[in-house]
Curated annotation (Swiss-Prot):
Protein name, UniProt field: Probable Dol-P-Man:Man(5)GlcNAc(2)-PP-Dol alpha-1,3-mannosyltransferase
Annotated GO MF terms: alpha-1,3-mannosyltransferase activity; dol-P-Man:Man(5)GlcNAc(2)-PP-Dol alpha-1,3-mannosyltransferase activity
Localization: Endoplasmic reticulum membrane
Membrane topology annotation: Multi-pass membrane protein
Enzyme class (EC, first level): transferase
Gene: alg3
Family: Belongs to the glycosyltransferase ALG3 family.
Pathway(s) the chain acts in: Protein modification; protein glycosylation
Organismal lineage: Eukaryota, Amoebozoa, Evosea, Eumycetozoa, Dictyostelia
GO cellular component: endoplasmic reticulum; endoplasmic reticulum membrane
Keywords: Endoplasmic reticulum, Glycosyltransferase, Membrane, Transferase, Transmembrane, Transmembrane helix
One GO-annotated biological process of the protein: protein glycosylation
Protein EC: 2.4.1.258
Coiled coil: none
Domain of life: Eukaryota
Amino acid sequence: MIENKVLPFIKNNQIKCFYTLASFLMIYELCINKIIIDYVKYTEIDWSTYVQQVEVFLKGIYDYTKIEGDTGPCVYPAGHLYVFSLLYNLTENGLNILKAQYIFAAIYILLTFIVFSIYGESIKESIKQITNKSNNNNNNNNNNNNNNNNVFLKIPFYIIIFLCLSKRIHSIFALRMFNDCISMLLFYISLYLIIKGRWNLGCLFFSCSVSVKMNVLLYSPALLFLLLSTFGIWRTIPKLMICGLVQVLLAIPFLMVNPQGYLLRAFEFSRQFLYKWTVNWRFLPEHLFLNKSWALFLLSIHLLFIILFFIKYIKKEQGGISNILKRGSINQNPKLLSVNYILLIMFTINLIGVTFSRSLHYQFYLWYFHTLPFLLWSTNYNLFLKIGFMCITEYAWNTYPSTSTSSLMLFISNFILLIQLYFQPTINSLREDKNNSSGLKKKKTK
């Protein structure tokens, strides 16, 4: 009897259920972060190095080749130094570790809130599409010509539970305090702005995120594709200029002193990773892991998969690539892309980069953890397979030190998910709004 009443209520009130569940989970996160800080020992890894780098910077030394700490030189762009200079001042010159932990716990809570907001937009769109389809079927509309294009995702409200269950992710914030926490917070703010149609602000925050750590560049091919799909080539250029201008403005003090040193240090793509820290390639022999040919092979496969997925997405576009490139030049209004289409492309292209990364360290789990539930629910896996996938992934990232088995499990699971995503039908690219025939009439896309 209870089941007969509860299930229909949940089905008909998914948005209310989402907000209720999200509220409880936020309270849970506040409590769990407090417990972690109070009862789990802090682990020093990079915080002291960040502090030492900031101290050199605050002394007025702007030559990037001279900014370093115990574990090495500063290999992050200028935004990293600005952010950690602020944290340095907030934590009594970096000495108040407990205060720093609480700040990073607050950053975790804020990031979780933003991610919940992104998933909320996704869930609302899914419910709207399901309702519209049901209404169309009931009204017997003759939409046979559009049936092939009527593909959308069914994202359930309870998916956000899986965003709060990772031991590793909690430790990255409250116990490790890596700069990845800052860069991913800025990225998710950027992504939320983008799905709300605030592209200029989205590009600004995206570039700020890159200025803290370059891993966010893994999303850049997807961002470029979405910009072209929305605005066309000419109207995309100002958005790219925003991204570039942010990097230049933040780097001015360092570019004026030693521009070559800054560019080589802050954007060093040839940096060699240590085999002992790799999470994803432990099953390879060390000599192969360190081989430059292996790095070039991974880069080639990375680019190949990006091209294959873009071809898949372009086929969904009416008029193909030529229509995308023409849009800005023939004065067409911007298109309003669907939330789930934006998220699927951004998250999938990032997963490609993660899967074929030269090396993943433990904190790099944060690069894609919050995207996994969405990607898994974008496939036709059953619930048990989806949960099993997340358990395998969590196991691999919590195995320390990594083993041949754990790293092989991680690579295979990521690779299988990529293949599954490739063979899924491409979802609708446009939002199902009455005003979307000419872009947007009521709400401007900026």
